[in-house]
């Protein structure tokens, strides 16, 4: 669930960023929200690269397959 939420959040941030760059290019007023630096730092350090978290996902996946939930 949290992975889906983060993917949707990335899509929204990318969409807002492209809207802002198009507005700057066309000379119209920029209407997107600025993304705070703290949010960007938190997002860049998102724990998908953390080996402990990856190991946790693998264990969870193995348990789901063993119990028949992953079919």
From Swiss-Prot:
Residues 1-20 form the signal peptide. The modification Tyrosine amide is found at residue 69. It is found in: Secreted. GO terms for cellular component: extracellular region. Expressed by the venom duct. GO terms for molecular function: ion channel regulator activity; toxin activity. Residues 21-31 form a propeptide. Its main location: secreted. Keywords: Amidation, Cleavage on pair of basic residues, Ion channel impairing toxin, Neurotoxin, Secreted, Signal, Toxin. The mature peptide does not contain cysteine residue. Belongs to the conotoxin NSf-1 superfamily. Probable neurotoxin with unknown target. Possibly targets ion channels. This is Conotoxin Pl071.
